[in-house]
Amino acid sequence: MRSAHIRSVAVAVAVTTAATGLAGTAFAGPGTGVHRAAAGTTTAQVAAAARAAAFAHPAATGVGAGDELRAQDVMIDPEGARHVRFERTHRGMPVLGGDLVVHLSRLLAYTGVTRAAEHPVAPATTTARLTARQAEEKAASAAGGEAGTAALVVDARDGAAALAYQVPVDGAGGGSTVVVDALTGKVRSNTPDSDEFLSPKVLETLRRRGETLDPATATGARPQALTGLSAAAAAHYPATAHGTGKSLFVGKVALTTTQTARRSFLLKDPTRYGTETRDAKGRETESFGQGVKFTSTTDSWGNGTTTSRGSAAADAQYGITETLDFYKKAFGRKGIANNSKPARAMVHWGDKVGNAFWDSTCGCMLYGDGDGDQIKKPLVVLDVTGHELTHGVVDATAKLEPTRIDSDGNQYGEAGSLNESLADIFGSNVEFFANNPKNPPNYLLGEKLGLAQKFLRRLDHPSLDRLEGTVDYWSPQVANAEVHAGSGVSSHAFYLLAEGSGRKTIGATTYDSPTYDGSTVTGIGRTKATAVFYRALTRYMVSSTDFHDARTATLKAAKDLYGASSVEYRTVDQAWAAVNVTAADDPAARH
């Protein structure tokens, strides 16, 4: 699961440009100095124009007196459109659910807005009845941990604005963020800061069935182009080296590492922004600095079994670098947050932890070793890593959030379901990108976990999943579905857009994708479908985007990329209709 990323609203962000399509698409990327949006126009000027447009069109944008907008991202499309994603404060207080994207033409004229809150974000009062100390006590009690400093915020989620306190809480099972109503003392939300791949619901189902996960590890070696002490002749250190990982799940893999001395190597990739994997040594720490560096005298990492602590590290580093390469080569994205900063991971995290996480506090992947009972091995599998790192991409863009979380940690709501779906969509794309014969690509998630049903989720026919109760089609009840169960709606739409309906075999996997209305959908191909969904995520989705909003976002993206009269645009509409998401059934009061 992902956390509702509401710990804080950034007060300073890098303004960057971003790609729009797949490999070969021209794009402007972030770098040092001034970024040029067009001849004579900087991205700072684009952000300023978008900010001015937001205040000049208050009826459309909802921006008003007391509001301040801070640019999170500036996106420049090859065809000339500009999009600026803003986070909002009101009278100096961060607004949860107040994010918006302002759209401009090539000439910086206002063309529209995508906003998370369609209601006023000004609370009825800005005077709290609770003290910060009282809010901290309530948060500590709710989350079962030690509270940090409470800060006043405006909570504009759930259709109304309220004055609240946001409180970080450090508990035994990891950090969480609690939002407490500043007038009534009611706990409005209590959200873990980490995203677990295996949800509490699926773990409970496995326990009830007595089913264990014993992922099958790889045997044999994958041929490598570069191995050994390739940087040994370097005159100066540190230097780029090319080593070999002997992983648990994909055999031998090439790893780019850092040579620090003649026979001293560090599991850190200098060609990918310093991306690094460390050893948590059984601690449940959210501080990457507390992880122990992996070093070697031979530039060989692991032995392919759990007897070497380096084996899981090899899998993790391989999965992270493949994910980074997918996003860069497909979309020009430079790192998870598109800021040319490293991706990071810690393996051997916690004592008998049977899960893997994206942790937004750490900004890194965390992998447990398994609990020794139900989960037998570390979940350092390629699609798990691609899925979880995509939550990081969503955190850096739309910040899709669930609408509620129960006492067991299960999350609910369409925006949260869409987040899970996007993680599955791009996680499967990472497999196709890597195209590793030891991990054949497919539209299944968790197929290497050793589950009795042979997968955790699948995109072509989601309801074949009997563990989480994933749905194939939208209905009004999906708004209250657990997020992994609800994710099937948009995952199914993506598969239909990419591959079409009916029976087909791709690689070694046979698919048979149904449609709600009995229609036949002819896919446009995975490359184009992925371009549409990525552009929709980065340009047209916000924290509250639901499935009908996602339909609108992908139609806008298809129009941008291929034109409103194109086959691609029509197929996007058909794919959503085939999962029962249409303009006609758009709920009038979903916001």
Language-model region placement:
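Active-site neighborhood of glycoside hydrolase catalytic domains
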Residues: 389
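Segments that shape or occlude catalytic/ligand-binding pockets
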Residues: 2-14, 18-215, 219, 341-358, ...
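Short, compositionally biased low-complexity segments
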Residues: 24-36, 103-118, 276-305, 462-467, ...
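Acidic/polar low-complexity interaction segments
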Residues: 164-168, 186-329, 338, 353, ...
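Zinc-dependent metallohydrolase catalytic domains
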Residues: 310-386, 394-591
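Topogenic and prosegment regions of secretory-pathway hydrolases and membrane enzymes
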Residues: 2-9, 15-17, 23-28, 201-276, ...
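Short, polar loop/linker segments at the starts of domains and inter-domain junctions
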Residues: 125-130, 265, 460-461
